[in-house]
């Protein structure tokens, strides 16, 4: 109640951002719209305010180049659903000041998020690039009749995902060989490379393939139950996050 009492709505942008220290832009994924919004934010916010974008794919340099105060602009990309997943990707542009990047990371850590800072811009940042690689192979395996979509999901949910929910891929392989990561690479580097060669080139997710995966998904989850399943997802995520937080305190 105390927090809600400090929140008020307004349709006047100048009123909304006139005294703020941080702005989180969440408009449509259209560069032209973001350019207009950032130009307006730059004119209506205090000089020291950080202007952050929630964009999922566009480097900040594509829509902040002409902003007068571009040194205080960057990307702070949250992960869906952002009210439960703590990770935030901090992506400075070539002209973002080091002070802005440091302040952004400190602010996110202060509000109990888990910020990671990219050393330079790349399209899609980190999480989406990893997700694109995994989804690309998942669709390929289904298209090539290697496995069905439902069993593919089990490979992550009941396999890799269990470890990945509390360890990253490098820590995973570091612990999967007696001598650590170098030992792992010496054992599996060549066969993994040969597999990777077979995963090129990238394929588009064509309509017949999407229809095939969708049909499998609708068999296990009818469309009218998606919202209910989203609530289930959120509750499950809450329990995972709570468990991780409790173990960090151990």
What do the PLM-derived regions correspond to, one by one?
Residues 102, 113, 149-250:
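NAD(P)-dependent Rossmann-like dehydrogenase/reductase catalytic/cofactor-binding core
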Residues 53-120, 124-128:
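Rossmann-fold dinucleotide-binding core
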Residues 82-91, 111, 116, 120-146, ...:
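Active-site-proximal catalytic alpha-helix in oxidoreductases
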Residues 1-51, 58-59:
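Rossmann-like NAD(P)-binding element
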Residues 1-2, 99, 147-149:
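A short alpha-helix-loop-beta-strand transition element characteristic
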């Amino acid at each position: 109640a105390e927090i809600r009492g400090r929140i008020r709505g307004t349709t006047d942008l100048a009123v909304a951002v006139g005294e703020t220290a941080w702005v989180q832009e969440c408009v449509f994924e259209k560069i032209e719209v973001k350019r207009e919004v950032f130009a307006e934010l730059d004119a209506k916010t205090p000089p020291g305010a950080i202007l952050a974008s929630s964009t999922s794919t566009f480097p900040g340099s594509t829509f902040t180049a002409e902003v007068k105060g571009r040194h205080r602009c960057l990307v702070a990309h949250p992960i869906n659903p952002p009210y439960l997943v703590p990770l935030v990707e901090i992506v400075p542009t070539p002209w973002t000041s080091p002070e802005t990047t440091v302040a952004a990371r400190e602010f996110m850590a202060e509000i109990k998020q888990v910020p990671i800072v990219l050393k330079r811009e790349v399209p899609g940042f980190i999480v989406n690039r990893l997700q694109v690689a995994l989804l690309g192979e998942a669709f390929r395996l289904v298209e090539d009749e290697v496995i069905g979509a439902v069993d593919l999901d089990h490979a992550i949910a009941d396999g890799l995902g269990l470890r990945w929910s509390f360890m990253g891929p490098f820590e995973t392989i570091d612990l999967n060989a007696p001598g650590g990561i170098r030992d792992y690479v010496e054992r599996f580097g060549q066969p993994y490379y040969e597999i990777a060669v077979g995963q090129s080139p990238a394929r588009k997710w064509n309509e017949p393939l999407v229809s095939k995966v969708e049909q499998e998904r609708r068999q296990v989850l009818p469309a009218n139950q998606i919202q209910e399943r989203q609530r289930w997802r959120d509750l499950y995520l809450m329990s995972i996050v709570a468990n991780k937080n409790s173990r960090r305190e151990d």
